[in-house]
Regions:
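An alpha-helical support segment within catalytic cores of ATP-dependent transferases
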Residues: 5-25, 121-178, 188-189, 233-239, ...
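Low-complexity intrinsically disordered segments
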Residues: 323-329
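A general structural signal marking secondary-structure boundaries and capping sites
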Residues: 76, 116-121, 166, 216, ...
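Active-site activation/catalytic loop segments of kinase-like enzymes and analogous catalytic loops
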Residues: 206-237, 247-266, 277-292, 296, ...
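Glycine-rich, phosphate-binding/catalytic loops in enzymes
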Residues: 66-67, 193, 210-213, 272
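Active-site acidic catalytic loop and adjacent metal/ATP-binding pocket
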Residues: 30-45, 49-50, 163-209
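Alpha-helical transmembrane segments of integral membrane proteins
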Residues: 71, 240-247
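ATP-binding pocket architecture of kinase catalytic cores
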Residues: 28-154
């Protein structure tokens, strides 16, 4: 089951970590979009997670990612690591048995993100800022003409308005996970663990907050969610930043997913109705929807774009733009 190209390195890792060269039991773990191969293994009657970064994985900063993971593990946010080798692309960590999420999951996530964002030692992404990546992807989406103008021209115009006023201040960047979706959150019955730190780097705090909010925060719980994160009721400016980032990410994820699907040759039906936002995310949490399939990616793209389209036509969008713009200009 372990790829032949990794078998020697895995045997060496097992020997260094546990003094053995064989695994008692091994089972593949699936569900994410990462190119890494992940397994649950048993060594000396204890379960561990084995993660293998495969050749051809997207270029990044493996050493920086592992340093971030080590920092998170030492802080008790990521599971304990038993072995890590960036050159071989091998990680062995504690395997956390998942329990059902608690009723107050939104508050728990917010408090966990506050701990993540207080960490030190994370680096900026080597390929440029997150905002630059967003702009590049949205531009590629626009150039690809994957949807008719009457569905996306307004989105592009309002996205541009948003990005003109949204702060890009490096001094505000914090240690970020950048992929806080259910597949990367494991609740053990007492505490929440974040796994898969492949995308970890310094970023705007509202990225993590917005990603997790898609899954766990209903509109009427926004104030409680942000208060749990900040430790005090959020200011109107903080609410506005959070709200605008959510809209920017709706456009970004819609663009990313449709461009990815188009490059894979997946048909895109511009007239297909978008699934309900909350229902689709509930099905993602339960595992009913598998985002590794091209069809699900297209559906999820339409979910995000429909959400953005609804919000850019609301008074709150205009108010948030004005508030953030006025704060940026003193």
């Amino acid at each position: 089951m372990i790829p032949e190209s990794k078998q020697t390195a895995v045997s060496r890792a097992l020997d260094e970590a546990f003094g053995v060269r064989e695994i008692t039991d091994i089972r593949p773990l699936t569900g994410g979009l990462s190119t890494a191969q992940v397994f649950r293994i048993v060594v000396r009657n204890k379960r561990y997670l084995l993660r293998l970064t495969m050749p051809g994985a997207p270029a990044g900063d493996p050493a920086g990612q592992l340093a971030s993971l080590q920092t998170a593990a030492e802080a008790g946010i990521a599971p304990h690591m038993w072995y890590v080798n960036a050159e071989d692309g091998i990680l062995i960590a504690d395997f956390v048995e998942a329990r059902p999420y608690p009723a107050d999951m939104a508050v728990l996530v917010a408090q966990t993100l506050a701990r993540v964002h207080s960490l030190r030692g994370f680096q900026k992404p080597r390929v440029g800022s997150y905002f630059d990546a967003m702009d590049k992807l949205v531009s590629a989406f626009r150039a690809a003409n994957l949807l008719p103008p009457d569905q996306i021209d307004e989105l592009f115009r309002r996205y541009a308005d948003l990005m003109k006023v949204y702060p890009r201040n490096d001094a505000e960047l914090v240690a970020s996970h950048n992929d806080v979706k259910p597949q990367n959150m494991v609740f053990d019955g007492e505490r929440l663990w974040l796994v898969d730190w492949e995308a970890a780097f310094l970023n705007d705090r509202y990225v993590d907050l917005s990603i997790s909010a898609n899954f766990f925060v209903r509109d009427d719980r926004e104030a409680a969610y942000l208060a749990a994160y900040f430790g005090t009721p959020a200011t109107p400016y903080q609410h506005a930043r959070f709200y605008l980032m959510r809209q920017a990410l709706h456009v970004f994820y819609g663009a990313f997913l449709l461009v990815t699907a188009a490059r894979a040759g997946t048909p895109i039906d511009s007239m297909a109705p978008a699934p309900d936002f909350r229902d689709f995310h509930e099905r993602l949490i339960s595992g009913e929807v598998d985002l590794t399939t091209p069809e699900a990616k297209v559906q999820y793209a339409l979910v995000h774009l429909a959400a953005a389209r609804r919000q850019i036509r609301t008074p709150r969008f205009e108010e948030a733009l004005a508030l953030v713009a006025s704060s940026a200009h003193g």
